[in-house]
Regions:
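Conserved Switch II/interswitch segment of TRAFAC-class P-loop GTPases
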Residues: 88, 101-123, 149-156
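Canonical P-loop GTPase G-domain recognition
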Residues: 151-230
Length: 233
């Protein structure tokens, strides 16, 4: 069994969450940042971290995956698995494989105005694959709007995401999913991590705002999944 097959088998136990978005939107960077933060704050609950990328272009060519533990207070080990999907057009079939069996999804939108069409195509494809599960609440959804460090005038804001969804044909479908749009900058979060760690002033209770913005949608989708699972019992 290959490493990729092992990862998929293990993800059947626990929570599976997928980062979805157009190529170069920031999916791998967001996952890498979260992994780095958890490794510093809670290393005992950080497991494998697998990256499959083209070294020349630094683009994901399969999927990225990281596994983390979640304390339950009962002594029972519980894991959540974070995946990214490859964004390039040629990997559409791979994206369908990666989202199989997921519990939650984080859509990463690229705020650069020039990437409007790529974002729209990505949203349309997502609903072609997961519409029923998103609409019935089986799959929980949060949205990251990345690259908010770009100059105003060259990027969109959270206020523009509604229009993007209308053009993608998913606005009405998303109305009842209770998804929040989180404005983030992976670049600013990375810079904040480097500065805080080099100064020795890292405090999990007062993380820099750019870092906290990356963590919030991940924590929210995990919380939504757990609440839904507990309500079944």
């Amino acid at each position: 069994m290959s490493q990729e097959e092992v990862v998929f088998e293990e993800s059947k136990q626990g929570i599976k969450i997928v980062f979805w978005g157009a190529t170069m939107a920031g999916k791998t960077t967001a996952l890498s940042l979260f992994h780095a933060i958890k490794k510093r704050e809670d290393p005992e609950n950080v497991y494998n971290f697998l990256k499959l990328e083209d070294k020349a272009t630094e683009r994901t060519i399969g999927f990225d995956q990281a596994t983390f533990g979640l304390g339950t207070g009962t002594g029972r080990e519980f894991k959540y698995h974070l995946f990214t999907t490859p964004g390039q057009d040629r990997f559409k079939s791979m994206r369908k494989i990666v989202v199989n069996g997921l519990h939650g999804i984080i859509v990463v939108l690229d705020s650069e105005s020039a990437r409007w069409e790529e974002n729209k195509t990505s949203l349309t494809e997502l609903f072609e694959i997961l519409e029923d599960k998103l609409l019935n609440g089986e799959v929980k959804l949060q949205i990251m709007l990345n690259k908010m460090d770009l100059p105003v005038g060259t990027r969109i804001s959270a206020a523009d995401v509604g229009r993007l969804m209308v053009e993608a044909g998913v606005s009405d479908k998303l109305r009842d999913t209770f998804a929040s749009v989180h404005e983030v900058s992976c670049l600013e979060a990375l810079q904040a991590l480097k500065e805080t760690w080099s100064s020795g002033n890292w405090n999990p209770k007062s993380r820099p705002q750019p870092v906290q913005r990356i963590i919030m949608p991940i924590q929210q989708v995990i919380r939504d999944i757990l609440v839904a699972e507990l309500s079944k019992n």
